């Protein structure tokens, strides 16, 4: 970098890479728009008791579900905001905690009781369910069997998983939308939240994310590639 000519050449490379990043973002948006369709907001109730509305999310592809691939890691959710006539936010769903996680059962802030669970969350991310020691199941970020002893040990399956199509100790709770399928998200804003002057405005955004933050937290002790 001592040579000014080298710095100018380096700047040209950086500008070219920035343009390519913009093009990549445009292509990603194009892929999402070709795969999903967000319907119109339908208000089903608007009185002194509550404000209720719904919005349909449709998979407009005929080849595979949405999301596809590693659907237990990929988030596709609705970010919903309701504001009053003064512009104040009176209702949120699909917002993030300070870590960047949705307010679902894997949020550290929800676990600690610092934020309420987002009971209206619309999320197409499938979840792993693992079998517990004394029966029953629970959601887990990583479906890896763990030993109760002090030594790390992954117990191998006693039966071939190819026969059952999945490991017997874990399964996935499917949340994806089938090809050409539709799922409707429904929301209700209770009367105690309908504060301030009207009219009330509803804003709905469909967002996609490759991996949740809680997955990064679960694997960070192992380390990352490229020295990250």
PLM region spans:
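Short, conserved sequence motifs used for protein processing/export or organelle targeting and
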Residues: 1-228
């Amino acid at each position: 970098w001592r040579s000014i000519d080298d710095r100018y050449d380096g700047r040209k490379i950086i500008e070219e890479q920035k343009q390519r990043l913009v093009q990549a973002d445009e292509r990603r948006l194009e892929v999402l728009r070709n795969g999903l369709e967000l319907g119109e907001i339908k208000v089903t109730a608007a009185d002194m008791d509550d404000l209720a509305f719904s919005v349909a999310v449709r998979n407009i592809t005929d080849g595979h579900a949405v999301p596809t691939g590693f659907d237990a890691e990929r988030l596709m959710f609705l970010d919903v905001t309701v504001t009053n006539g003064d512009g104040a936010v009176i209702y949120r769903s699909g917002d993030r905690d300070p870590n960047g996680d949705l307010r679902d059962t894997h949020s550290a802030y929800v676990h600690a009781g610092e934020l309420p669970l987002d009971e209206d969350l619309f999320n197409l991310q499938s979840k792993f369910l693992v079998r517990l020691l004394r029966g029953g199941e629970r959601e887990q970020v990583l479906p890896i069997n763990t030993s109760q002893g002090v030594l790390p040990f992954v117990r191998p399956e006693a039966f071939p998983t190819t026969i059952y199509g999945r490991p017997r100790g874990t399964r996935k709770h499917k949340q994806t939308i089938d090809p050409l399928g539709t799922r409707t998200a429904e929301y209700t804003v209770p009367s105690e939240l309908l504060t301030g002057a009207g009219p009330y405005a509803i804003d709905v955004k469909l967002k996609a994310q490759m991996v949740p933050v809680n997955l990064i937290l679960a694997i960070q002790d192992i380390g990352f590639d490229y020295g990250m």
